[in-house]
UniProtKB/Swiss-Prot annotation:
GO terms for biological process: folic acid biosynthetic process; one-carbon metabolic process; tetrahydrobiopterin biosynthetic process; tetrahydrofolate biosynthetic process. PROSITE patterns: GTP_CYCLOHYDROL_1_1, HPPK. Disulfide bonds: none annotated. Its EC number is 2.7.6.3, 3.5.4.16. Pfam families: GTP_cyclohydroI, HPPK. GO terms for molecular function: 2-amino-4-hydroxy-6-hydroxymethyldihydropteridine diphosphokinase activity; ATP binding; GTP binding; GTP cyclohydrolase I activity; kinase activity; zinc ion binding. The keyword Acyltransferase does not apply. NCBIfam families: folE, folK, PRK09347.1-2, PRK09347.1-3. InterPro entries: GTP-CH-I_C/QueF, GTP-CH-I_N, GTP_CycHdrlase_I, GTP_CycHdrlase_I_CS, GTP_CycHdrlase_I_dom, Hppk, Hppk_sf. The gene is folKE. This is Bifunctional protein FolKE. SUPFAM superfamilies: 6-hydroxymethyl-7,8-dihydropterin pyrophosphokinase, HPPK (SSF55083), Tetrahydrobiopterin biosynthesis enzymes-like (SSF55620). Pathway: Cofactor biosynthesis; 7,8-dihydroneopterin triphosphate biosynthesis; 7,8-dihydroneopterin triphosphate from GTP: step 1/1; Cofactor biosynthesis; tetrahydrofolate biosynthesis; 2-amino-4-hydroxy-6-hydroxymethyl-7,8-dihydropteridine diphosphate from 7,8-dihydroneopterin triphosphate: step 4/4. It comes from Lactococcus lactis subsp. lactis (strain IL1403) (Streptococcus lactis).
């Protein structure tokens, strides 16, 4: 296995969350083993772009991946954590760079090792210096560069590593158990905080996602785009943002293509999952499905009808078991043309 040093940084949103999550995702790869993690640092941005400070760290990993394979997987991890490459050296949820790959020196179109900016960046070198041995090829060069950069305008200081979101949820669940009169240390509840934290990660998996990207568009004969494309009975579940109780049901989604553009059929259920797997209300889910589909396709019309059962209605308050809430949203021809709207509604009977 090859010893590799990675530099990581984040300056958007919950910075430590993105760093912890990136470490977790990297470590899940069967050909990557996380050996050491540096302290967490806060640094001022470089490059002239006005933006928030960064949280940085370094990783020492052992890998069986070749450099370009590793780079490709790193890009997958960055993409999964909402990395957008809009501004060079600009703000980002996560940035992962290969700094050193054993003693390798290489230069290809999209990868230079050692990283070409490494010896100009205090936030890269100081965390890595924690992880290297004195016999490392670049030890003396790193030590010298740190001494020189420490008197520059680059600001860097160690910060406290925060608990991961999962750890924070576990602590909160223990407090709730105490507050309702339970004993978190009794046998039946010992694993409950961890189970609840894992459950929240699963059912609120879209909570930190800023954009729906899981779709592909196709072209068809534009003369055949007057008919309705409908997928009905799409199951969904979500959690009410008012009481954090579940609600679940079915979504029915239709659109009329324009300019020969259609979306892969499996992507509409994925869109329903995306908008529902976060704290929300049914009205927002209904509108979000329609608005996002409109942004993607710019179709002639969109129709959405959602039917849901709400535990905040059935288990508390009025306690009306089996009651159904229906919400609808119409855009374009479905809003303006009664016949199209009725065709959609009658197809659901």
């Amino acid at each position: 296995m090859q010893t590799t040093y990675l530099s990581m940084g984040s300056n958007i949103g919950d910075r430590q969350y993105y760093l912890h999550e990136a470490i977790r995702l990297l470590g899940k790869h069967p050909k990557i083993m996380i050996e050491k993690v540096s302290n967490f640092y806060e640094s001022t941005p470089v490059g002239g772009v006005k933006q928030d400070d960064f949280t940085n760290l370094a990783l020492k990993v052992a890998t069986l991946l070749e450099p370009l394979e590793l780079l490709s997987f790193i890009h997958e991890v960055e993409l999964s954590l909402n990395r957008e490459r809009k501004i060079h050296w600009g703000p980002r949820t996560i940035d992962i760079d290969i700094i050193f790959y054993d003693d390798l020196e290489m230069q290809v179109e999209n990868l230079v090792i050692p990283h070409k900016e490494a010896f100009n960046r205090l936030f890269v070198l100081k965390p890595i210096f924690e992880l290297i041995d004195k016999d490392f090829k670049y030890y003396a060069s790193i030590e010298k560069a740190i001494a020189e950069l420490s008197v520059s305008e680059q600001e860097l200081h160690v910060i406290k590593e925060e608990k991961t979101p999962r750890n924070r949820i576990e602590d909160a669940v223990k407090e709730i158990l105490f507050a309702v009169g339970e004993n978190p240390n009794r046998e039946g509840l010992l694993e409950t905080p961890a189970r609840v934290a894992k459950m929240y990660e699963e059912i609120l998996s879209s909570q930190r996602l800023s954009k729906f990207n899981e779709y592909k568009l196709f072209e068809i004969d534009s003369s055949k785009t007057d008919s309705i494309v409908l997928i009905k009975d799409i199951p969904f579940y979500s959690m009410c943002e008012h009481h954090m109780l579940p609600f679940f049901g079915k979504a029915h989604v239709a659109y009329i293509p324009a300019d020969g553009k259609i979306i892969g059929l499996s992507k509409i259920p994925r869109l329903v999952d995306y908008v529902s797997r976060k704290l929300s209300v049914q009205e927002n889910i209904t509108h979000d499905i329609g608005d996002i589909l409109t942004d993607i396709l710019n179709p002639k019309g969109v129709a959405v009808l959602v039917e849901g059962r709400h535990m905040c209605v059935e288990m508390r308050g009025v306690k009306k078991v089996n009651s159904i809430t229906k919400t609808s949203y119409f855009l374009g021809e479905f809003k303006e043309n009664n016949e199209k709207r009725m065709e959609f509604l009658e197809s659901l009977l």
